């Protein structure tokens, strides 16, 4: 068996997420459809991050195994995949890796970014790629909020609850980068719970708009609550940035 590792990017707005779903257009589904055509076998694609509907990726990583190479070099497969895949998926790199490499379980750190366009006037060309907020955000409060999330916390109040054995997550990096009207949040961790980054961003925006207090956000991180601190931020601003192995 040959184990292929592929790095790719995609625009998430017309996908029902990464993971294959019956009757839905997904990134995994598009990849597997083209790979079956090329290798003449059913192939299961494994993704490092299972992005939700509308979420983009700049550095998603997948792996899949084939019985034979079908005379595909890494360079040739890179070119053919980019030719056959739809225009909202771009292959960035193709490698052959050790048999034990697993895109999801071998990952050491996942990075996400979230993009906010903070301007009174809307920008139609950014609409599907960010969260437009037309009221001014307090950047100092955003920075202070981001610092609260560093370290190990129970994120039960900041995710969609599924059958998780453990909702404790260690956040390695949590910071904002500001460039004029673009406010970009960077966050990294070994893994994330479902919609966790979007709930984190939504909560920071509540503080940044001065709708809620920074001290209240700190309490939510320490104590389990029945109600949410905020709604999740829209999917359009979220990007799977890169995966560290």
From Swiss-Prot:
Any idea which UniProt keywords this protein has? Isomerase, tRNA processing
Q: Where does substrate bind?
A: 112
| Pfam families on file | PseudoU_synth_1
Q: What InterPro entries does UniProt report for this protein, alphabetically?
A: PsdUridine_synth_cat_dom_sf, PsdUridine_synth_TruA, PsdUridine_synth_TruA_a/b_dom, PsdUridine_synth_TruA_C, TruA/RsuA/RluB/E/F_N
| Residues annotated as the enzyme's active site | 52
Q: Which reaction does it catalyse?
A: uridine(38/39/40) in tRNA = pseudouridine(38/39/40) in tRNA
Say which family it is in.
Belongs to the tRNA pseudouridine synthase TruA family.
Q: What is this protein called?
A: tRNA pseudouridine synthase A
- The gene is truA
